[in-house]
């Protein structure tokens, strides 16, 4: 197996699952286990696999169940996990998903998103439900004068779009993740909107692409507000985009439709519009890993797709994510953090006091000069990606894969793509024909805000 040169202990989830399947087959007494994640509206996701019998290597059995259940939660979302097939796996997960358990972060996050207490429930085999999917139409509207705003962790982008033509776009550096006062966030967002509006005769709609989880345009969870005290989250943070749109509506004396979507889904939407096709998985590698999906019907599934928190590395000593407290999750493999991590693994010493965005720029500058360590960093991220695509494909039906974000900029992005394709062809030939690509440099940088502009239907 081709491993990252700077991270030799990487143990891809797909390899771990294949090894586990081999172990189960060797044992000869497979136990059928079903995990069901339930979310709002009665929608659910059903995943069935074969496990070892109770009492046979319980530690491995439990770890596989825990990694799979966690992956499903961050792919699909949910406030309830049902378990059928193994009482001991059920008991283990029930203890793990508590505020005192190893999955306390997940419990707190999901109960906040869905505004319901999180629980793990036993199911008899004959009670396992059929899967119930959603498919929601998003975006692709281009009529009128539109503002598209993309709230990145390091810069904010805004576009003014008139009947599908971009008349203005800008990127402005900001620091939302280290700012405690939410009025800073509000004023920065409003300033961006007003700048775009000043380039058009009127404003008909506002579309927003932003990292995090959104329900009815409300901010349920978002890393942009990481430093804002939870007591201030209430209505002030939760309704921030709604309130900005109200202020813009007052300026123009009419109600301006607003649509807020997860930045990952907008990434995928940008790709679907560009490709004129569906089945698009978009991955934006920037401050974190943002993932979105446009299904084969051209809609979104109503899934979280917060794969920044989904495991990609089964190695128990993988790098820890500071926010979730978990190890081996996507945000440390497909983001600027991955570049920094691999640079440090390679013995590189950054100057004191640099922000993560500045550290990325240091490595990008080295890459522009064809520095061998920088090239190795990007190659290793390509190896990570090649081993992760078959794991993601267990949950998403992927025809096209679109790679965006700051990490994919310049020569480094080309190395990631070329390495990924090469390793896929060698190790996973069934994925060799997958269409994986980068948008051109301009749409790479501002494509998100332009796609965001297409989100709302006009009145």
Task: Indicate where each model-derived feature is located.
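Gly/Ser/Thr-rich active-site cleft segment
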Residues: 202-240, 287, 331, 336, ...
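Transmembrane beta-strands of outer-membrane beta-barrel proteins
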Residues: 147, 206, 281-285
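Short, flexible micro-motifs
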Residues: 155-156, 210-215, 285, 289-293, ...
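ATP-binding/phosphotransfer module of carbohydrate and carboxylate kinases, centering on a glycine-rich
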Residues: 1-173, 178-205, 213, 250-253, ...
């Amino acid at each position: 197996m081709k491993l990252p040169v700077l991270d030799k202990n990487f143990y891809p989830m797909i390899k771990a699952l294949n090894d586990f399947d081999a172990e189960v087959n060797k044992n000869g007494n497979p136990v059928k286990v079903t995990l069901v994640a339930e979310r709002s509206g009665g929608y659910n996701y059903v995943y069935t696999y074969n496990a070892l019998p109770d009492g046979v290597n319980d530690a491995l059995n439990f770890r596989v169940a825990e990694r799979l259940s966690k992956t499903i939660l961050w792919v699909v979302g949910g406030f309830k996990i049902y378990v059928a097939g193994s009482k001991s796996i059920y008991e283990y997960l029930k203890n793990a998903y508590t505020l005192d358990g190893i999955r306390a972060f997940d419990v707190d996050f999901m109960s906040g998103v869905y505004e319901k207490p999180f629980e793990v429930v036993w199911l008899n085999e004959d009670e396992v439900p059929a899967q119930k999917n959603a498919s929601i139409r998003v975006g692709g509207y281009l009529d009128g004068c539109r503002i598209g705003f993309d709230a990145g962790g390091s810069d904010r982008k805004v576009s003014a779009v008139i009947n599908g033509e971009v008349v203005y776009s800008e990127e402005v550096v900001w620091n939302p993740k280290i700012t405690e006062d939410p009025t800073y966030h509000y004023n920065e967002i409003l300033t961006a909107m007003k700048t775009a509006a000043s380039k058009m005769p009127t404003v008909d709609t506002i579309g927003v692409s932003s990292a995090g989880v959104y329900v009815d345009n409300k901010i349920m969870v978002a890393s942009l507000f990481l430093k804002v005290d939870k007591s201030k989250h209430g209505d002030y943070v939760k309704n921030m985009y709604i309130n900005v749109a109200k202020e813009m509506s007052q300026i123009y004396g009419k109600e301006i439709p607003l649509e807020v979507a997860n930045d990952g889904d907008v990434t995928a939407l940008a790709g679907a519009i560009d490709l004129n096709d569906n089945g698009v998985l978009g991955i934006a590698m920037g401050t974190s890993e943002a993932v979105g999906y446009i299904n084969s019907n051209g809609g979104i599934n109503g899934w979280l797709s917060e794969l920044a928190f989904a495991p990609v590395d089964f190695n128990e000593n993988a790098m820890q994510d500071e926010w979730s407290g978990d190890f081996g999750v996507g945000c440390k493999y497909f983001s600027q953090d991955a570049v920094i991590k691999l640079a440090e693994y390679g013995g590189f010493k950054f100057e004191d006091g640099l922000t993560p965005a500045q550290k990325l720029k240091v490595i990008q500058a080295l890459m522009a000069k064809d520095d061998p360590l920088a090239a190795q960093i990007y190659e290793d991220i390509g190896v990570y990606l090649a081993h992760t695509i078959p794991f993601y494909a267990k949950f998403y039906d992927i025809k096209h894969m679109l790679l965006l974000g700051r990490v994919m900029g310049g020569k480094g992005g080309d190395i990631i793509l070329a390495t990924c394709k090469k390793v896929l062809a060698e190790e996973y030939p069934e994925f060799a024909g997958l269409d994986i690509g980068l948008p051109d440099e301009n749409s790479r940088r501002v494509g998100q805000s332009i796609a965001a502009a297409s989100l709302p239907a006009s009145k």
